[in-house]
C-alpha cells in the first residue's frame, strides 16, 4: 500500500462513515464460514479487490457467495474521482509481474465460474494497462478454461489500439462505466469525459458486434430523471446491452456528498425505461457494476429480462 503524501490520497479506511440512511438502505450483513474462507483466500494471495479498496457495501454479501472483484494493475489510481475511495497517486509503481498468477490462484481456490476484473486507471502507461490486463486474462483462461471473464476497464484515454488489444483477449463482457449523467461528469469524474466513454463503448460494439457490452451509472448525485432517461438512451444508441444503476453512497466526508436517496420504486421505473430501449437493466439501491455479475450474465444468456427478483 502506498504511503499517503502530497501526491497520494486515501480517505479513512474501515467502515463507511455514518450517515442517516433511509430504511431501504439498511442491511443485515451476512457472515459465516464462506465469508471467512473468501476473506482468507484474498488475504493469502495478497490481491487487492475493489470490494475492500472502494468500501463496497456489498462486500459481505458477495464474499458469502464466494465472489469477489479483483483490482488489477495495483491499488493506486492516476485519477482522483470525487466518488471513489481508491488511492490516488501521480507516480504509481510498476505492475506486479506476479499479479496474473495471484489472481488466477485466488479464483481457482474460490472455484469462480465468472471472474470479474476491474482496474485502476493507469494513465502513466502507454497503453493504459491494456496489455497487462490481457496477461491476466490469458492466465485465467489457462488456469480456469471453463470460466468466463468480465472486465471493467478505464477509458484508456481514448486509445483505440489499447481497446482493441483488450477486446482481442477473449473476454466475455466488456464493461466501461459512464458513472453519471453528462452534466455531472466534470464534477464526478477526474480526467474523463462522458462523450469519450460513449465513444469507447461504441467502438467496442463496432469491433466485436457479438460481444456483451456493459455500462453503469450511480444515482443520487443531483441528476434529474430526464437526464437518467437520456443517459439510458445514449447507452443504447452506442451499442451497450447491459446497464447497472445503483445508489451513490459517499465513502467519507471528503467525497462528493449524496444529494438524494433514490427510492426502490424509482429504480424500478428506470429499469422499465431501459428495458423499453432494448437494454438489460439491473437496478436497485445496492447495485454496483460487478454485484451479482454472474447472475446477470446467466439471466442475459437465458433471455430472462425480469431481474426484479435478483438480490439488490
From Swiss-Prot:
Listed EC numbers: 2.8.1.8
Keyword line: 4Fe-4S, Cytoplasm, Iron, Iron-sulfur, Metal-binding, S-adenosyl-L-methionine, Transferase
Binding of [4Fe-4S] cluster 2, residues: 77, 81, 84
One Gene Ontology term, aspect cellular component: cytoplasm
Domain Radical SAM core residues, every copy: 63-280
Location within or outside the cell: Cytoplasm
Gene3D superfamilies: Aldolase class I
GO molecular function (one): 4 iron, 4 sulfur cluster binding
Cofactor: binding details: Binds 2 [4Fe-4S] clusters per subunit. One cluster is coordinated with 3 cysteines and an exchangeable S-adenosyl-L-methionine.
Family: Belongs to the radical SAM superfamily. Lipoyl synthase family.
Protein name: Lipoyl synthase
Organism: Chlamydia caviae (strain ATCC VR-813 / DSM 19441 / 03DC25 / GPIC)
Lineage of source species: Bacteria, Pseudomonadati, Chlamydiota, Chlamydiia, Chlamydiales
Amino acid at each position: 500500500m502506498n504511503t499517503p503524501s502530497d501526491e497520494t490520497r486515501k480517505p479513512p479506511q474501515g467502515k463507511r462513515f455514518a450517515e442517516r440512511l433511509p430504511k431501504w438502505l439498511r442491511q443485515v450483513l451476512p457472515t459465516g464460514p464462506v465469508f471467512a474462507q473468501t476473506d482468507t483466500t484474498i488475504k493469502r494471495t495478497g490481491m487487492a479487490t475493489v470490494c475492500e479498496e472502494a468500501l463496497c457495501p456489498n462486500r459481505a454479501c458477495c464474499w458469502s457467495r464466494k465472489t469477489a472483484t479483483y483490482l488489477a494493475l495495483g491499488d493506486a489510481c492516476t485519477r482522483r474521482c470525487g466518488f471513489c475511495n481508491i488511492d490516488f497517486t501521480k507516480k504509481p509503481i510498476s505492475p506486479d509481474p506476479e499479479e496474473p498468477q495471484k489472481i488466477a490462484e485466488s479464483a481457482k481456490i474460490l472455484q469462480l465460474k465468472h471472474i470479474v476484473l476491474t482496474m485502476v486507471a493507469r494513465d502513466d502507461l502507454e497503453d493504459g494497462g491494456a496489455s497487462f490486463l490481457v496477461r491476466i486474462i490469458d492466465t485465467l483462461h489457462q488456469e480456469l478454461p471453463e470460466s468466463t471473464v468480465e472486465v471493467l476497464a478505464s477509458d484508456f484515454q481514448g486509445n483505440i489500439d489499447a481497446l482493441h488489444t483488450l477486446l482481442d483477449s477473449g473476454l466475455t463482457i466488456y464493461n466501461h462505466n459512464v458513472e453519471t449523467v453528462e452534466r455531472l461528469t466534470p464534477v464526478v469524474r477526474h480526467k474523463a469525459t462522458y462523450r469519450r466513454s460513449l465513444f469507447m463503448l461504441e467502438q467496442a460494439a463496432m469491433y466485436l458486434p457479438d460481444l456483451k457490452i456493459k455500462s453503469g451509472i450511480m444515482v443520487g448525485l443531483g441528476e434529474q430523471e430526464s437526464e437518467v432517461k437520456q443517459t439510458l438512451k445514449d447507452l443504447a444508441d452506442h451499442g451497450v446491452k447491459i446497464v447497472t444503476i445503483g445508489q451513490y453512497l459517499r465513502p467519507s466526508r471528503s467525497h462528493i456528498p449524496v444529494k438524494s436517496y433514490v427510492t426502490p420504486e424509482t429504480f424500478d421505473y428506470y429499469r422499465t425505461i431501459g428495458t423499453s430501449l432494448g437494454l438489460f437493466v439491473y437496478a436497485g439501491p445496492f447495485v454496483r457494476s460487478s454485484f451479482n455479475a454472474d447472475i446477470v450474465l446467466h439471466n442475459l444468456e437465458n433471455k430472462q429480462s425480469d431481474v426484479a427478483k435478483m438480490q439488490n
